[in-house]
């Protein structure tokens, strides 16, 4: 009877009993592999060969790139020739120039454009003046007023020529209505 209990254990070969796959967990097995790989690639473990820390670009180079971006802020995509010129001025590789612009368009450019909008000298007008100016610039034939431009409604009408008259009649009706006031007098 004792032989029957030992039977399955005796069917394994001595090599299978002692193999790392049978006696160790997968994490231990991986560490064995990495120990074996560390012996062959010992050079990679030396401090001199570690990945270099990311450094900032030289301040003078960044200033040149920022100046170029500010001048071209509405189309901040330098051509290959412009990248080459910037590369020579900044002593940076074309790849670093391209990467700087990719990041700067996300990080710096929105601030540049926002700053321009907030500048009281350069920025946009606010309030009624801005609305009137906008209307003047978009529709030269209509005098600027602080209400909706109804005349352009039928011009942009998706209806065919037959129904354009109906749109024009509707716009005339809207124009003839008195404006509603928000506060009673």
From Swiss-Prot:
Q: Which PROSITE patterns match?
A: HOMEOBOX_2 (PS50071)
Q: One MF term from GO for this chain?
A: DNA-binding transcription repressor activity, RNA polymerase II-specific
Task: Report one GO cellular component.
Answer: nucleus
Q: Which Gene3D superfamilies match?
A: Homeodomain-like
Tissue specificity here reads:
Specifically expressed in adult testis.
Keywords associated with the record: DNA-binding, Homeobox, Nucleus, Transcription, Transcription regulation
Q: Which GO terms describe its biological process?
A: negative regulation of transcription by RNA polymerase II
Q: Where is the composition biased (Polar residues)?
A: 21-39
What CDD domains does the entry give? homeodomain
Lineage top rank: taxon: Eukaryota
The entry's DNA-binding region: 48-111
Q: InterPro entries from the entry?
A: HD, Homeodomain-like_sf, KN_HD, TALE_homeobox
Region Disordered: which residues? Answer: 1-58, 166-185
Q: What does this protein do?
A: May have a transcription role in testis. May act as a competitor/regulator of TGIF2LX.
Instruction: Note the PANTHER family from the entry.
Output: HOMEOBOX PROTEIN TRANSCRIPTION FACTORS (PTHR11850)
Which family does the UniProt entry place this protein in?
A: Belongs to the TALE/TGIF homeobox family.
Q: By what name is this protein known?
A: Homeobox protein TGIF2LY
Q: Lineage of the native species?
A: Eukaryota, Metazoa, Chordata, Craniata, Vertebrata
């Amino acid at each position: 009877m004792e032989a029957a209990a030992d039977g399955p254990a005796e069917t394994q070969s001595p090599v299978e009993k002692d193999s790392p796959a049978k006696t160790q967990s997968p994490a231990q097995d991986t560490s064995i592999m990495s120990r074996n790989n560390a012996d062959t690639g010992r050079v990679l473990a030396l401090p001199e060969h570690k990945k270099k820390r990311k450094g900032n670009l030289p301040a003078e180079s960044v200033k040149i790139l920022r100046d170029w971006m500010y001048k071209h802020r509405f189309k901040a995509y330098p051509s290959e020739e412009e990248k080459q010129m910037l590369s020579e001025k900044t002593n940076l590789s074309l790849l670093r120039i391209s990467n700087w612009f990719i990041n700067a368009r996300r990080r710096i450019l929105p601030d540049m454009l926002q700053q321009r909008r907030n500048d009281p000298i350069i920025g946009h007008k606010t309030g009624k003046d801005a609305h009137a100016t906008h209307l003047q610039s978009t529709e030269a034939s209509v005098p600027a007023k602080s209400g909706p431009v109804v005349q352009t409604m039928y011009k942009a009408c998706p209806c065919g020529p037959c129904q354009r008259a109906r749109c024009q009649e509707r716009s005339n009706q809207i124009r003839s209505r008195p404006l509603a006031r928000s506060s009673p007098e």
